[in-house]
Amino acid sequence: MANLTRRQWLKVGLAVGGMVTFGLSYRDVAKRAIDGLLNGTSGKVTRDRIFGNALIPEAQAQTHWQQNPQQTIAMTQCFGCWTQCGIRARVNADGKVIRIAGNPYHPLSQEHPIDSSVPFSEAMEQLAGESGLDARSTACARGATLLESLYSPLRLLEPMKRVGKRGEGKWQRISFEQLIEEVVEGGDLFGEGHVDGLRAIHAPDTPIDAKHPSFGPKTNQLLVTNTSDEGRDAFLRRFALNSFGSKNFGAHGAYCGLAYRAGSGALMGDLDKNPHVKPDWENVEFALFMGTSPAQSGNPFKRQARQLASARLRENFQYVVVAPALPLSTVLADPRGRWQPVMPGSDSALAMGMIRWIMDNQRYNADYLAIPGVQAMQQAGEQSWTNATHLVIADELPTLAGQHLTLRHLTPDGEETPVVLNTDGELVDASTCRQARLFVTQYVTLADGQRVTVKSGLQRLKEAAEKLSLAQYSEQCGVPEAQIIALAETFTSHGRKAAVISHGGMMAGNGFYNAWSVMMLNALIGNLSLSGGVFVGGGKFNGVSDGPRYNMNSFAGKVKPSGLSIARSKTAYEASEEYRDKIAGGQSPYPAKAPWYPFVAGQLTELLTSALEGYPYPLKAWISNMSNPFYGVPGLRAVAEEKLKDPRRLPLFIAIDAFMNETTALADYIVPDTHNFESWGFTAPWGGVASKATTARWPVVAPATHRTADGQPVSMEAFCIAVAKRLHLPGFGDRAITDPQGNTFPLNRAEDFYLRVAANIAFMGKTPVALANQEDISLTGVSRILPAIQHTLKADEVGRVAFIYSRGGRFAPEDSGYTEQRLGNAWKKPLQIWNADVAAHRHAITGERFSGCPVWYPARLSDGRAIDDQFPIGQWPLKLISFKSNTMSSSTAVIPRLHHVKPANLVALNPQDGERYGLQHGDRVRIITPGGQVVAQISLLNGVMPGVIAIEHGYGHREMGATQHSLDGVPMPYDPQIRAGINLNDLGFADPTRTITNTWLDWVSGAAVRQGLPAKIERI
């Protein structure tokens, strides 16, 4: 028993005295209170009579930083969500992670990060005492609790093979070597008949179908999917695309934010990388958030939350959040910001209404929009330009419709240079003109004698906005006409110190054009790369390139995938054999059997469902690395799960994962993967950081997964290396990597790859990073991996790579993101008021030409039918939306503490709807959609627009430990709490207009639809 002081006796007396007043029925409570004071609340004596069992501090900082010699503070990467912040992990002498906080060197964890040149101990001192009040570097709820998943009993640590039928949840242990043998060589693996292994599938010289050579080689019958780039994407792509050579690779973007990214890419003129912008938080005067809610969601999540909080302190800052449900970004008591409700999937009606008012009232930046080229931009002292004045062929003519008029069209020997109408009314080369006319409609005679109508890009946008009146736009989006005008007027009243940003709220049945129209508002005021406007990120130190120390991109025998992706990405339907065969047979080529996506890539939403239907060809194997479409894609479970359980449709399924997610549970083989704190990797901010930055992840503790025969931890990398070496694929093995001098180096272990990437990062630019000193190496725990660094790298690389890991990455000075009045990286391409690449194509189902500029389309199905026509509002009066949780993410369900904070997700309805359906706050209801039904507890909140059900995302798992499996006949650990709540994606549905069955997708980009699902509700 701990010794009692007089003060403690007084506390006991006060506690007992207070409880006596509650009567004898509370004697047990009183007893527990006394026991807690005497012996600790757990019944065990606490380590300290004052601090209880609190962690021993990592250091004392009274005069200078004196770190606890029993702890190291490792700077690494978080993976609690897709922001992937830099964090610091406290690791004790036993090699156990005991606490997580933020990395003060990292721009995603510190609003104004500490410069990397500051020694580690000095940086830590700045976080302590009074200075720590201003410079505290923290982690969010997900990051702070991520260590619990590292030690979760739900982790998968050894290779497993299914027994019984696919999806039954019965497994057996196998060695890593047996797993490699079976998946490579194939055979009668499950007593269900022969299964081709990866050796048989890897046939780069054999066509899938000799009658359809455009499909490409049999190698394409391997699908590889990755959750996304959590730091190791480059390694997996090296294996799948450039070593094995498959065309079919996918990531989760199609069910995360593809509609927004593609719409943004259309404006930015880059539909390959789909770049996007973020606001200059320190100088913006008016911010409009449409489809994103900083502090509630968005990326970077934590950084934007801090920046919004700081911006609120400025007198000249205002903001509006446009969303169907009130987010944490704004509160009713905040005079700086307000919430504007909007109907789900109607953002472009609001945006186009604003654009119409801006056009009608000439509130656009005319001088900026009149700049027709780079030379004129430089002469005007601008930082960006648009193609608003470039002339577009408006007539529906083969190969010409929607294309920009060029000098080649006017004269046979002319160049492919856009043409504008200058201020004197003359047709001139856009690159030599200083100012061009904004609004043009006139006839032009082409070199071949054709007389065509041409219009300027801005004229086309104006006409698109004029398709509806403000009253009609108001009716479509549910925002009063006066509010549309007020938003447009306010947005254009701050010069260029206004900004619009968006993200996942665009994932609707018209998401691509929603996103493009929203982001177009930035172009109309000319705010790109300017103080108070928006900017593209500062970029990253790309060590996976052919860098200063190693060629990490090029290697002998590197394969360029060929043929057709099953998702039909970046391929025009009109170039397909299906189209040509229909034309040859005298048929109308439209509709195709399924949508094609001529200018957008990344449709994991199409890859699996198309393969299971054998269109355009079947798959033979799937390797999934942590991907989980069966949890993340609305309606996919109902559409595809039973089909995937049939091995005849997809004979071999290998999942690489640290946990049994909803998709991994359907696999034939499971390769256990290392945890975030056990693995290597490199990531970079998605946006919102003006300076260049790259995060370094490294094994701060020893991996817990089983070992291979040669001592490697089993992981994604170990699997790829073993398969590649067994098949003698290029890019792996003893002589896989070269340096600029032609020397060769091995790729036999994960660190062979990542440490050489780190060396490239360390030496990039005019000056390499500094050498790490011994104190930094020791205090940050880099000493644990120093032997691997010394063994793998050249002597002059060791100290600089150690420096990279001691800082958790490489970060350019914060002020490097601001140069000559420009914020962030320069954007050299013209903003696309009219995108001719989009306008060049037709929709493969309806045959209609895609609009080359933003325009209002209602949410629609694949055949062009409006969703409300297929599912009438009279029968389906409500619309479902999902919103990001600020505590739980889809991958953190295995963390118990997050469930303790919030056991189930919020499912919210407006009180007006509650009254309409006879519901009280807390009632249990049945939510029904065309795809299914779930039971939930409803909350009645004024912060939800009438007609909307808002569902918090991240809950309602069926796997991730929610269901018990068996291993060698022994029940595996599980936690039924993980099943709590509901998942909106279980309510998604199949598009009834499609021939090749799939879920409801955005008709342009193929992005999953999770905003605006038709629904109804019943009280239970």
Curated annotation (Swiss-Prot):
Gene3D superfamilies: 2.40.40.20, 3.40.50.740, ADC-like domains, Dimethylsulfoxide Reductase, domain 2. Disruption phenotype: Mutants are defective in tetrathionate respiration. The keyword Methyltransferase does not apply. It is an enzyme of class 1 (oxidoreductase). Binds 1 [4Fe-4S] cluster. Its EC number is 1.8.-.-. [4Fe-4S] cluster binds at residues 78, 81, 85, 140. Probably composed of three subunits: TtrA, TtrB and TtrC. This is Tetrathionate reductase subunit A. It comes from Salmonella typhimurium (strain LT2 / SGSC1412 / ATCC 700720).
